[in-house]
Amino acid sequence: MSGVNEIRSTFLNFFAANGHEIVPSSPLVPRNDPTLMFTNAGMVQFKNVFTGVEKRPYHRATTSQKCVRAGGKHNDLDNVGYTARHHTFFEMLGNFSFGDYFKENAIELAWKLVTKEFGLPKDKLTATVYIDDDEAFGLWKKIAGLPESRIIRIAGSDNFWQMGDTGPCGPCSEIFYDHGDKIWGGPPGSAEADGDRFIEIWNLVFMQYEQLEGGVRNPLPKPSIDTGAGLERVAAVLQGKHDNYDIDLFVALIRAIADLTNADPQGPQKASLRVIADHLRASSFLISDGVLPSNEGRGYVLRRIMRRAMRHAQLLGAREPLMHKLVGALTREMGQAYPELIRAEGLIKETLRLEETRFRKTLERGLAILDEKSASLSKGDMFDGDVAFTLYDTYGFPLDLTQDALKSRGISVDQASFTDAMERQKAKARAAWAGSGEAATETVWFPLREKLGATEFLGYETETAEGAVTALVKDGAEVDSLKAGESGAIVLNQTPFYGESGGQVGDTGVLTGEGVRVRITDTQKKAGDLFAHIGTVEQGTLKLGTPLQLDVDHIRRSAIRANHSATHILHEALRQVLGDHIAQRGSLVSPDRLRFDFVHPKPITAEELARVEDIANDVVLENAEVTTRLMGLDDAREAGARALFGEKYGDEVRVVSMGNAARDHGNNAMGWSVELCGGTHVKRTGDIGLIAVTSESAVASGVRRIEALTARGARAHANHNLSLAKAAAAELRTTVDEVPARITALMEERKKLERELSDARKKLAMGGGAAAGGAAAGIREVAGIKLMARAVDGVEVKDLKSLVDEAKKQLGSGVVAIVGRSEDGKAGVVVGVTADLTARFNAVELVRAASEALGGKGGGGRPDMAQAGGPDGAKAEAALAAIESAIGKAG
């Protein structure tokens, strides 16, 4: 058992055989946990289980969890590549007990696995326990037979785990492997503990207390177990390696990088190879879990990881984007264990390629400035933090890249001055923002939510209902009434009006009561689930407690329903045409149109877009039933329901299914499209009528947008396009079907005529006489050389160059200057100097003299050919005279 994949399987299968549920790794973006940027431990997905908030159908679990530590408190980024065991991405093997077994079974299982299944020699293993955990100390003696000298008591946080300031906590027990006295270091707890001889391979956490405020700890009624073993560390030990980067997985990745860069895996570029191998894993897994490079949040951390790897690719001499070429090697090594890598392979490759292409320009600019500003520094010096901030703020060059680039020279960055510069920038931004007062008007809703509770939403079943006013808000404050002509927000005890959320706009309609009428123009959700009906009192006075008839605008709601259901159908159609990596990034569902943003690395072709539209309309024509059901969140996910990336969901979710499940690319037995959604939808897909995609565009890096119309809007769009086609056909005197061919023929004819016109103008310009420039035409001698100077009309600047080249050949030796006047009154000028005269006359200097006469500035080119322009074409003769004068002075 030597390979990483076999080690992972052995671990999981061992615990499965001992009554544990094998639970798939959760995504790297934690679900419903805003406190974490990335999943960084195996217990993260079980956090609510340990605290009793969530119930699972099992009491024992085992996982191999994807983890990232880069950014925030857990940040290993700067050390990766330069140490034997630091990674940004790693796998955490673990077993968990939720109130089932405790210390004795946990130690027994761990010992059996490492000694029997993994076959590690007992005399190479040492255990640690918390300083006063006598129970664990005794169990290691009893179960493992370890002598007391190899059961080490440790004080402090290293051997006591806490979820936070309050909550579950407990002592830890760690298993260490002894690499032998050939490597420096001492056992844990000793003065030499920081050495590399004794390596921790497994940590067992015994959750047996609940910590209260003030530091009081009470025993938990059902103690639990949380363990974690780094797969890469375990593999290194089992493969007889002292360095994680020497295990089979990394050897394969590093070999793939070395093959593409001709680098020596054991040579001076070893650190760069390791950085790329590690960061390739982190980048690929983050992208497969829905994170895309951006300038904030998780996307910015991903961008930093990617760009650090790309910087090292440049150090290896890669002249073209490299990272995307390595994804195949990664999927070969890890795709079987993590099929999401294979599903997202296309997206990963394209995202890496695009980012590296963009970053190479940034890298060139940043490194040039860095080299210039650090040229005078020596080993031990400190680089100016203000300059480092300028590189970051102006050129997009992250601080860690600056540090990394200077590290090899022994130069550090003044982080204090970098931080000061960052704070000054933030202060300027705050000062520049005058503020809108919007935040102040929002504070009223939180106490209202606590007082009134959630608004009961009736809108899934009905568009009309009765309700009573429970609160009125005007200008951010509660009021007792709203008079005729006044506007405000009305809160009701129940409502059929949909509050804006999930991309769907809020409902409009009318509230009526005895002597009262209110026009509702929008409905919003406040403080989570309090519905605020925004409107104006048209008649009477609206007071607290007023009973009302509530009527949603039926026609508008029907259009919104059709558009919302269409977004689900388009989502699935996009996946069918473009691939399983398609994931929603946002949407707008309004009565007159829909907009859908999704992950895709490149523009969609016209052919692909047509296929998407065809598939979507096939589903509409099926007139299949649209069903909704309430399910537990985990049940819905297991059933294959798609969730919106970044959206927070409760324990119970609404699942919307539509389309015939038997269709090609069907999602699952529940339907062709199955999504978590709280919006309103049609009863049958046929109610949508028609879907017409009207545009496709880019929103951000790796994010595309399509816009579409449905029902009456789609029909109007189709009719409008047909009218345009008929009008074009009539104008072209052909049929609608023949319009494209007729346009192509006309375009070819136009190009031919333009070429003929250009040739005629050039011939006319070179023909001499008044038509070609009058007195300015002809060849004359100035300062002992021949000068051909002409002003011409209707010849473009690009054609002036060819005229000058031709004239230079005719002259043999001399200077050619031609000014071309355009119809808008501007002018372009091109000057050519034959090769034998460039030592005496510089075309750039001559053309600048002409540009000044034309009212322009500058000009550029080579000593033998240069061009410029100016706004005043009437001064063409003066420009030629200026060139002649400049030749006279130079000669």
Swiss-Prot record:
SUPFAM superfamilies: Class II aaRS and biotin synthetases (SSF55681), Putative anticodon-binding domain of alanyl-tRNA synthetase (AlaRS) (SSF101353), ThrRS/AlaRS common domain (SSF55186), Translation proteins (SSF50447)
Cofactor: Zn(2+)
Compartments where found: Cytoplasm
Keyword Cell inner membrane tagged: no
Example of a GO MF term: aminoacyl-tRNA deacylase activity
Keywords: Aminoacyl-tRNA synthetase, ATP-binding, Cytoplasm, Ligase, Metal-binding, Nucleotide-binding, Protein biosynthesis, RNA-binding, tRNA-binding, Zinc
PROSITE patterns hit by this protein: AA_TRNA_LIGASE_II_ALA
Reaction(s) catalysed (UniProt annotation): tRNA(Ala) + L-alanine + ATP = L-alanyl-tRNA(Ala) + AMP + diphosphate
GO BP term, pick one: negative regulation of DNA-templated transcription
Annotated binding of Zn(2+), by residue: H564, H568, C677, H681
UniProt xrefs under SMART domains: tRNA_SAD
GO CC annotations, alphabetized: cytosol
Known EC number: 6.1.1.7
Co-factor note (free text): Binds 1 zinc ion per subunit.
InterPro entries, alphabetized: aa-tRNA-synth_II/BPL/LPL, Ala-tRNA-lgiase_IIc, Ala-tRNA-ligase_IIc_anticod-bd, Ala-tRNA-synth_IIc_core, Ala-tRNA-synth_IIc_N, Ala-tRNA_ligase, Ala_tRNA_ligase_euk/bac, DHHA1_dom
Domain description: Consists of three domains; the N-terminal catalytic domain, the editing domain and the C-terminal C-Ala domain. The editing domain removes incorrectly charged amino acids, while the C-Ala domain, along with tRNA(Ala), serves as a bridge to cooperatively bring together the editing and aminoacylation centers thus stimulating deacylation of misacylated tRNAs.
Entry function: Catalyzes the attachment of alanine to tRNA(Ala) in a two-step reaction: alanine is first activated by ATP to form Ala-AMP and then transferred to the acceptor end of tRNA(Ala). Also edits incorrectly charged Ser-tRNA(Ala) and Gly-tRNA(Ala) via its editing domain.
Stated family: Belongs to the class-II aminoacyl-tRNA synthetase family.
Family matches, as NCBIfam families: alaS
The protein's name: Alanine--tRNA ligase
Organism the protein comes from: Bradyrhizobium sp. (strain ORS 278)
